[in-house]
Amino acid sequence: VDLLHGAFLIHDDVIDRDDIRRGSPTIHADVRDRLALRGGDPAEAAHDGVSMAIIAGDLALVGVQQILLASDLTDHQVRRALGILGNAATVTLGGELRDVINGAIPADADRIRESSWMKTSVYTFEAPWRLWAMIAGRDEEPMVPVGRDLGRAYQAADDLAGAFGATADTGKTAGGDVKRGRSTLVTMRDGAEADVIAEVIA
């Protein structure tokens, strides 16, 4: 799950053009800056940085499968785990696509909430809890609504931190969504969302 999470973050940093993650340079930014110091073409350095980040994210995705196949889980559990994680990856990628589209086309609150669920809830909360329940021989379904709500709350809090937090505190590029014109519950100009933001802050 950590490898899957890492893969998504690496690719997300490329898509969002974020140079900082957890207080350190992102992979594409680190490679770009190291190559630029050698006096090469800045555009080529930037391209190579993106290429390296894509490859690193892809390797992490492959690593998820390799770890499961080498685990002590039964064949049935491995197949089920691959299904859970595969579904999580598919939904998350769909959410990432929607997030990109939301930056080009104004989105309403419902669409933003749906994107947040797809982009964050499934792989961060729902999939891990499904895995734990499956391995323990328990029912997976009761974990889903809780994971969905926690994921949406986490994404809303992350949007707030990204919009108003300082890089030194959040470890991320400050104001990224605002600068890119990305539609989030925070950046929406619809006053009807004020109560939603107030709930998140509380």
Predicted regions and their residues:
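All-alpha prenyltransferase/terpene-synthase fold signal
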Residues: 1-202
